[in-house]
């Protein structure tokens, strides 16, 4: 099995609600789905409001909040829904669909091998005066081994807002039963991994400046002070474990979403304006990022010969821990707010 970065705790408790209806009508946005279906501990961190079968695929709805302590903590004006909010909504919809439609048992954990995000209409993400009503049309392919044993699921989702196709997201996962996952982690480390809820919430070092990484709330800063050498910028990944949007439940590793946030923040430290939106993101996770060992992110121009990081541009961010590459993320940015069409 591929070693990966993110694991979301399985929801072994049966869902008391009946299976969602078929997609003969548009998804509804009146209540959230059972939080256990999307592997969230807090109801207020659930964005999916509806999930229906749609032929061989599925159709979901998600309500995007106008204000959120993490996803809404950005200086871009006019305000826009963040690409990581779209990714989290897609993750939740795919997780629930996996359990309901694609044979993933409730005691199974998803391990994210990689994902891709492409924003196809940046204007569609501009926030209005009401919460966004995101429609997610998705499909999935099961990866099976001998005897039909499930090894993983690959999801592909198209996301639309107000009738405009806004983004396309692909998520590649492996799967493991809960006990198999615990055995895997022990064998890899030769020890039981620590968990986030037991970690000291005191900052490991001096954090990066919040404004410099596009944040107002210091709790949302996930990097330490940067180091610049040649054409590269590096910084330690040091998230705040008490941030309940990033760590909704207890983890035994640094989750993928935190690494992608670290990559974006490092891009801003490398010179990308904090009001420049992410237009595309691809990520690959090759190892678990352990909690009890330092990890460093390094940003370089994604394409040889690229000049200063002035959007539109691309940056490659590499994560290293104990001398090995554990993850890679490539981010593309569009023009900063106020520079569109310039």
Residue ranges and their predicted role:
Residues 1-78, 174-246, 342:
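Non-catalytic linker/capping segments at the edges of enzyme domains
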Residues 3, 55-109, 233-269:
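Hot-dog-fold acyl-thioester-processing enzymes
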Residues 81, 85, 95, 99-111, ...:
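Extended intrinsically disordered, low-complexity coil regions enriched in Ser, Thr, Gly, Ala
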Residues 96-140, 264-302:
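Hydrophobic beta-strand-centered segment that forms part of the acyl-chain substrate-binding groove
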Residues 218-287, 291-296, 316:
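Acidic/His-leaning functional-site neighborhoods
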């Amino acid at each position: 099995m591929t070693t990966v970065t993110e694991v979301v705790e399985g929801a072994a408790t049966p869902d008391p609600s009946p299976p969602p209806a078929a997609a003969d009508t548009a998804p509804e946005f009146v209540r959230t789905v059972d939080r256990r279906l999307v592997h969230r501990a807090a109801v207020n961190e659930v964005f999916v409001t509806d999930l229906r079968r749609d032929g061989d695929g599925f159709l979901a709805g998600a309500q995007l909040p106008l204000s959120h302590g993490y996803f809404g903590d950005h200086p871009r004006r006019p305000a826009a829904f963040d690409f990581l909010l779209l990714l989290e909504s897609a993750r939740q919809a795919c997780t629930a669909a996996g359990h309901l439609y694609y044979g993933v048992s409730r005691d199974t954990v998803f391990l994210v091998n990689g994902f891709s995000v492409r924003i196809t209409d940046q204007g569609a993400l501009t926030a209005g005066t009401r919460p966004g009503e995101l429609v997610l049309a998705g499909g999935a392919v099961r990866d099976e081994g001998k005897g039909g044993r499930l090894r993983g699921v690959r999801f592909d989702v198209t996301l639309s807002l107000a009738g405009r196709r806004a983004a396309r997201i692909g998520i590649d996962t492996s799967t493991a039963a809960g006990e198999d996952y615990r055995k895997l982690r022990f064998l890899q480390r030769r020890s039981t991994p620590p968990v986030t809820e037991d970690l000291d919430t005191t900052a490991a070092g001096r954090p990066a400046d919040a404004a410099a990484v596009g944040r107002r709330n210091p709790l949302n800063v996930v990097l330490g002070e940067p180091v610049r050498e040649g054409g590269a910028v590096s910084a330690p990944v040091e998230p705040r474990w008490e941030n309940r949007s990033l760590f909704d439940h207890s983890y035994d590793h640094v989750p993928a979403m935190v690494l992608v946030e670290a990559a974006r923040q490092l891009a801003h430290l490398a010179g990308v304006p904090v009001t420049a939106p992410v237009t595309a993101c691809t990520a690959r996770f090759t190892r678990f990022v352990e909690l009890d060992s330092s990890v460093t992110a390094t940003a370089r121009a994604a394409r040889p010969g690229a000049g200063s990081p002035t959007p539109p541009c691309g940056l490659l961010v590499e994560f290293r821990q104990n001398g090995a590459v554990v993850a890679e993320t490539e981010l593309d940015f569009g023009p900063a707010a106020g520079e569109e069409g310039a």
